[in-house]
């Protein structure tokens, strides 16, 4: 098997704080914190104490950032092959893998200290479990082992609303699990759409994403099926009395639009449509949770 190339390291003097920030995948962490904050705000009537909002999200962000750093290290060789990732700090050699792992360890330790001392142990251990699930189980094993990597590993990425919820209540509750289920159902169509757009790169890197192993048509059909499942799952907060009419209208509108993208992708098999589907999926998730939050402060359960 031909070894994947690793770019030559650059001189240490070129390292900046921006390189370390990039290791933490700040955009991904920001989306996770958005869903965590919404989980906190949905957990109880009114607004949680400022200390829970501050320290809870700080701890979650630190541990999420640590998981992202480990991902950079584990995927170093893969990242050098893909155009989207070849300029990452570890892939280019700007930051050595051991330095990155040390940085991840510091972030994880700080995150655990913040959550245990300032929030509660349940949230701390659940967040750590998410880190291990993403950085260990998914990145080290599932990503390279099965085309169902996203489906199985998606649970780790779906945890932030539950973490926010437990930060406020100190316990796992059914409505919090509904939020996890929504993100869990959203994950496959989100990543498979990107995988269709980047199919050649994933194949070159040896990652068995569904379009690589089973083809575009099979993947597009499964995107449609998961989008239908997501539409159904997204209505559960209304069905269970967690939310009201505002959320129902918003969830239907957003979900039907997502379904339209999925149908268009299945009919056209176009890389541009796949990319647009991927982009819309991000808008969908953010908008859905914002609508759920707005509904929470307007709707009063009977």
Swiss-Prot record:
Cell membrane is among the record's keywords: yes
UniProt GO MF annotations: protoheme IX farnesyltransferase activity
Top-rank taxon: Bacteria
Topology with respect to the bilayer: Multi-pass membrane protein
Gene3D superfamilies: UbiA prenyltransferase
Keyword terms of this UniProt record: Cell inner membrane, Cell membrane, Heme biosynthesis, Membrane, Transferase, Transmembrane, Transmembrane helix
Subcellular location: Cell inner membrane
Stored PROSITE patterns: UBIA
Catalytic activity: heme b + (2E,6E)-farnesyl diphosphate + H2O = Fe(II)-heme o + diphosphate
Main location: membrane
HAMAP family in alphabetical order: CyoE_CtaB
Protein role: Converts heme B (protoheme IX) to heme O by substitution of the vinyl group on carbon 2 of heme B porphyrin ring with a hydroxyethyl farnesyl side group.
Family: Belongs to the UbiA prenyltransferase family. Protoheme IX farnesyltransferase subfamily.
Misc note: Carbon 2 of the heme B porphyrin ring is defined according to the Fischer nomenclature.
Entry protein name: Protoheme IX farnesyltransferase
Organism: Marinobacter nauticus (strain ATCC 700491 / DSM 11845 / VT8) (Marinobacter aquaeolei)
């Amino acid at each position: 098997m031909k070894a994947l190339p690793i770019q030559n390291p650059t001189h240490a003097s070129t390292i900046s704080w921006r390189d370390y920030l990039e290791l933490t995948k700040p955009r991904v962490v920001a989306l996770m914190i958005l869903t965590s904050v919404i989980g906190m705000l949905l957990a109880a009537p009114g607004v949680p104490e400022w200390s829970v909002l501050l320290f809870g999200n700080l701890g979650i962000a630190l541990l999420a950032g640590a998981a992202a750093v480990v991902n950079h290290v584990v995927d170093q060789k893969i990242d050098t092959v893909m155009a989207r990732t070849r300029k990452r700090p570890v892939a280019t050699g700007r930051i050595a893998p051991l330095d990155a792992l040390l940085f991840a360890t510091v972030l994880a330790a700080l995150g655990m200290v913040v959550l245990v001392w300032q929030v509660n142990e349940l949230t701390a251990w659940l967040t750590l479990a998410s880190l291990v699930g993403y950085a260990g189980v998914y990145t080290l094993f599932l990503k390279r082992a099965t085309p169902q990597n996203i489906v199985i590993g998606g649970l780790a990425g779906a945890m932030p609303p539950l973490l926010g919820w437990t930060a406020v209540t100190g316990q796992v509750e059914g409505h919090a699990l509904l939020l996890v289920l929504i993100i869990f159902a959203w994950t496959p169509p989100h990543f498979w759409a990107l995988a269709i757009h980047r199919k050649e790169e994933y194949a070159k890197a040896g990652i068995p994403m569904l379009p690589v192993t089973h083809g575009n048509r099979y993947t597009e059909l499964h995107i449609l099926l998961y989008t239908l499942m997501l539409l159904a799952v997204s209505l559960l907060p209304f069905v269970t009395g967690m939310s009201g009419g505002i959320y129902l209208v918003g969830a239907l509108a957003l979900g039907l639009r997502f379904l339209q993208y999925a149908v268009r992708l299945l009919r056209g098999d176009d890389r541009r449509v796949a990319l647009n589907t991927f982009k819309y999926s991000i808008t969908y998730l953010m908008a859905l949770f914002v609508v759920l939050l707005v509904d929470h402060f307007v709707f009063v359960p009977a």
